[in-house]
Amino acid sequence: MPVKQQIGIVISNKMQKTIVVKIENRYPHPMYSKTLIKTKKYLAHDELGECNIGDQVLVEECRPLSKRKRWKLIKILSKSSLIN
């Protein structure tokens, strides 16, 4: 089974070694063809704690690391221009 990878935006980094990533999925409505956006939030493992809010990241599915954490950070695609 291939490993699933997704691109998302970091919306929280308040926890130790954990980030919350928002992933948007766009798809057309089957009848009306309007583009709909479905948003999901995933907890991802950030071992070094290098992500900030607003960063665009690549996450990969992995074995369960805790009750809700099943994704890990692969790399930061672009840094946020927000200053913390």
Curated annotation (Swiss-Prot):
GO CC annotation, single: mitochondrion
Places the protein is found: Plastid, Chloroplast
PROSITE patterns registered for this protein in UniProt: RIBOSOMAL_S17
Chief localization: plastid
Record has Plastid as a keyword: yes
GO molecular function, one term: rRNA binding
Record keywords: Chloroplast, Plastid, Ribonucleoprotein, Ribosomal protein, RNA-binding, rRNA-binding
Coiled coil, from the record: none
GO biological process: translation
Highest taxon of the lineage: Eukaryota
UniProt family annotation: Belongs to the universal ribosomal protein uS17 family.
Role according to the record: One of the primary rRNA binding proteins, it binds specifically to the 5'-end of 16S ribosomal RNA.
Subunit structure comment from the entry: Part of the 30S ribosomal subunit.
Protein name according to UniProt: Small ribosomal subunit protein uS17c
Organism of provenance: Phaeodactylum tricornutum (strain CCAP 1055/1)
Species classification: Eukaryota, Sar, Stramenopiles, Ochrophyta, Bacillariophyta
